[in-house]
Amino acid sequence: MVRKTALGLCGMVLLAGGPALPAAFAQSSAGADVQTLDLPPSGFFTSLVLAQGYKESKDAFQTDRYKPVNPGITFKSDSEAIYLVFDILPRESPAHILGQLFLAKDAGRAEDRLLSEESVYLQTSQDSGFIEFLRPKEGWAPGEYKVKIHIGEKITDASQLGTLRFRIIASK
């Protein structure tokens, strides 16, 4: 009898929306989510790197595989493009992976500046891919850049998986 009453009370509390969370806890949870999105994504990707290029090969199932060429986090301003090269976990549905390239805020810029949005659509048989970020028309300005990585058909606050950062230095 006591057990049924306790279960009934727990069920009523849950149906009523549960106990209210303290405001401090709710704020710290929201801050943790923002901090997590500013880190490299984990879980969905088995490999994820920025590189100066990529090399294509076939695996045992004759599926295209992409391997990074000259991976790093620092690139020269005369680079034609920066590539986001990745492998993802097997899945039951196709994946639409999007990347937003930003020139990161600094002393001269109050906000990140969006430079481009690129995407790739992977069928269920594809576990490897890349996104190419071409040199902007005005060239790569030396400084910090970031790539926000999303999954889905369009970019929303909920679609972001994480962020990668890199630096452009002046060519000699």
Which functions belong to the PLM regions below?
Residues M1-C10, G18:
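Bacterial N-terminal signal peptides that target proteins for export
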Residues G8, P22-A26:
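Short stretches within intrinsically disordered, low-complexity N-terminal or propeptide regions
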Residues C10-G11, V147:
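Enrichment for repetitive, rod-forming helical segments
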Residues L15-A23:
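C-terminal segment of classical bacterial N-terminal signal peptides
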Residues S28-K137, A141-P142, K148-G152, T156-R165:
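Contiguous segments within soluble domain cores/interaction surfaces
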